A protein has these predicted regions:
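Core dinuclear metal-dependent hydrolase active-site scaffold
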Residues: 10, 87-113, 118
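Conserved beta-strand hairpin/beta-sheet module of binuclear metal-dependent hydrolase folds
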Residues: 1-39, 110-123
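Divalent-metal (often Zn2+) His-rich catalytic cores of metallo-beta-lactamase-fold enzymes
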Residues: 134-189
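Active-site environment of divalent metal-dependent phosphoester hydrolases
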Residues: 26-27, 50-56, 76-77, 106-109, ...
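Divalent metal-coordination and catalytic microenvironments
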Residues: 11, 21, 49, 84, ...
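Active-site metal-binding motif and surrounding structural segment of the metallo-beta-lactamase
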Residues: 26-70
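Active-site neighborhood of phospho(di)ester-bond hydrolases with catalytic His/Asp-centered motifs
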Residues: 20-23, 42-51, 70-73, 99-104, ...
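C-terminal regulatory/interaction regions
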Residues: 184-253
Length: 253
């Protein structure tokens, strides 16, 4: 699920630095980060969200250097010693890193802005789309980052994006297109998550079907929130906990 791996950033200003998203607790990776810090003064360990490929090395690394960890909220394998809220600023050297709360991929997701650069974690990644827990929040968070008018994006996976406006516009367009496809699939008679995935995500690797189902469900909930369809939540069996009960609006093309 991590594509080419997780990106860890060492952000330096003068002699001071912070580490952003140190990653999983792998010894070789820990040694590589410490080698990169070298003679710099580590001032803190910053985390975008608590997924296991981003955060678990944060607490042990910070303990080793006697510095704080920063993040939105505790989660599996990570408990920030300083909790950040939207707009909170971290100063080190001449640099200021500003937390931007961007729920959607996860509820606890923070991006970090530094001048014209935004560190986007798993909100926007290079060369792929991301899994989304809450689509309404996710759309709002994309608008939020677009409104900052960043020049470049440095993601948690994949390559840097030097044309941020283009990358954000492509993300928003992709999500709108996906949602229109799903609404059409419901209009055409799909009544379960599996049915929607079948109709819309034809090309998906069978091993990633659970991920497609998660995204489809997030879109369906968003469509229901907008009053375009209604969902019926039953007892269900884990991966199929509900049915689409009714289409309130004819599918539009
Ligand atoms: Zn993630």
């Amino acid at each position: 699920m991590t594509g080419p791996g997780t990106n860890t950033y060492l952000i330096a200003s003068g002699r001071d630095c912070v580490v952003l998203d140190p990653g999983p607790p792998e010894e070789s990776h820990r040694r590589a980060i410490i080698a990169a810090i070298g003679n710099l003064r580590l001032r803190g360990v910053v985390v975008t969200h608590t997924h296991p490929d981003h955060a678990p090395l944060a607490d042990p690394l910070a303990a080793e250097f006697g510095v704080h960890t920063y993040g939105y909220a505790p989660g599996p394998g990570f408990s920030p010693s300083r909790r950040l809220r939207d707009g909170d600023r971290l100063r080190f050297g001449e640099a200021v890193l500003t937390a931007v709360h961007t729920p959607g991929h996860t509820a606890d997701h923070l991006c970090y802005r530094m001048g014209g650069t935004v560190f986007t974690g798993d909100h926007i990644i290079g060369g792929s789309t991301v899994l989304v827990e809450d689509m309404g929040e996710y759309f709002r968070s994309l608008d939020r980052i677009r409104a900052l008018r960043p020049g470049r994006l440095l993601p948690g996976h994949g390559s840097r994006m030097d044309n941020a406006a283009e990358a954000i516009a492509a993300y928003i367009a992709h999500r709108r297109e996906r949602e229109a496809q799903i609404l059409r699939a419901v209009g055409d008679g799909a009544r379960t998550v599996a049915g929607v995935v079948e109709a819309v995500y034809e090309e998906v690797d069978p091993r990633l079907r659970f991920a497609a189902a998660g995204s489809a469900l997030a879109h369906l909930r968003h469509l229901a929130d907008q009053g375009k369809i209604s969902l019926e939540y039953g007892e269900g069996t884990g991966d199929e906990p509900w049915e689409i009960a009714a289409v309130r609006e004819a599918a539009v093309s």
